[in-house]
């Protein structure tokens, strides 16, 4: 009865909260204009990634350990955003503790970035050996239901690399992307994402294209922690601080009969490989209570991050949408923000 009510409720709300789809898939074909001089720097950087992809991960990681301190002095804005987010989510941490997490976070990010070229330049056997999986039994359990799966994946440094794992093991995957504005970069990133097949939709295509793909037998990748503004969001606690949280996940589940599997992407610094973390799929989801469903999404996201803080992209503006009267915590030049978030 609850499922029938939820389906009816979400169906009535879909026109309000989910943009119409145009099925605008990313065009991954190579264009001659990509060879224009304005892209030469991009091609040089891709060449560097190509060379790095053939250097053992242990050697690359050792280099990252050496230069992370120097790099932190050139990433002032990212550092401040990271410290602000950590203060908002973990108010009991001292400034020294937050700076330590930031340094670890930057080191992990650098190791992942320098390994980007592997998905483009290395062979299948190499890629297969670069993964370890925690919780594979939860994936098998979800697949046994015969229903489409939405992998709920928070923003982690290794999110693209570990997302490839799902396609690599034979799952038909779809996801959405937001263009960076750099055609060569987008072509490179989506060439990696589509290495083992699947579909990548432009974000402006709307969520209905994902729902249609799920009904057609695909599985989807969903980022639950995005802040896309007050529209299609409710304010629900995230690590104790109210956040404008997306309401589309329970709607997708209701309209496509999909199940939700928490998914986290890690770079394992000890083993120099990528770790896919899977957890048990949501039971009785969605319910008739939209806010409770969004809270469950945030709670699952928190659980994935705790103990793996250095893997999470803390420099993103997860709390940029404020309630009326609230101070914008990302006002880096605001003395109140400086005192509250960037000092002990």
Predicted regions span which residues?
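Non-catalytic C-terminal accessory region of glycerolipid acyltransferases
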Residues: 21-34, 100-103, 140-143, 168, ...
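Hydrophobic alpha-helical segments typical of transmembrane helices
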Residues: 47, 82-85, 188-189, 248, ...
């Amino acid at each position: 009865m609850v499922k029938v009510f939820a389906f009816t409720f979400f169906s009535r709300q879909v026109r309000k909260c989910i943009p119409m789809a145009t099925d605008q898939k990313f065009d991954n074909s190579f264009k001659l204009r990509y060879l224009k001089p304005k892209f030469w720097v991009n091609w040089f950087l891709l060449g560097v990634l190509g060379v790095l992809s053939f250097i053992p991960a242990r050697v690359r990681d050792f280099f990252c350990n050496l230069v992370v301190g120097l790099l932190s002095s050139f990433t002032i804005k990212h550092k401040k955003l990271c410290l602000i987010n950590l203060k908002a989510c973990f108010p009991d941490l001292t400034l020294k503790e937050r700076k330590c997490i930031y340094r670890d976070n930057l080191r992990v990010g650098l190791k992942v970035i320098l390994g980007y070229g592997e998905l483009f330049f290395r062979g299948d056997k190499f890629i297969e050996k670069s993964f370890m999986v925690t919780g594979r039994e939860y994936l098998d359990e979800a697949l046994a239901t015969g229903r489409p799966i939405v992998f709920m994946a928070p923003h982690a440094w290794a999110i693209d690399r570990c997302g490839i794992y799902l396609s690599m093991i034979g799952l038909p995957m779809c996801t959405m992307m937001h263009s960076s504005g750099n055609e060569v970069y987008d072509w490179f990133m989506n060439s990696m994402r589509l290495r083992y097949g699947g579909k990548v939709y432009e974000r402006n295509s709307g969520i209905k294209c994902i729902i249609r793909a799920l009904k057609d037998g695909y599985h989807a990748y969903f980022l639950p922690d995005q802040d896309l503004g007050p529209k299609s969001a409710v304010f629900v606690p995230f690590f104790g601080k109210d956040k404008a949280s997306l309401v589309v996940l329970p709607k997708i589940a209701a309209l496509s009969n999909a199940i939700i599997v928490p998914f986290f992407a890690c770079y394992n610094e000890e083993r120099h490989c990528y770790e896919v973390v899977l957890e048990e799929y949501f039971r009785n989801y969605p319910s008739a209570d939209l806010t409770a469903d969004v809270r469950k999404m945030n709670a699952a996201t928190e659980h994935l991050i705790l103990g793996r803080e250095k893997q999470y992209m803390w420099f993103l503006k997860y709390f940029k949408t404020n309630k009326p009267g609230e101070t914008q915590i990302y006002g880096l030049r605001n003395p109140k923000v400086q005192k509250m978030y960037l000092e002990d």
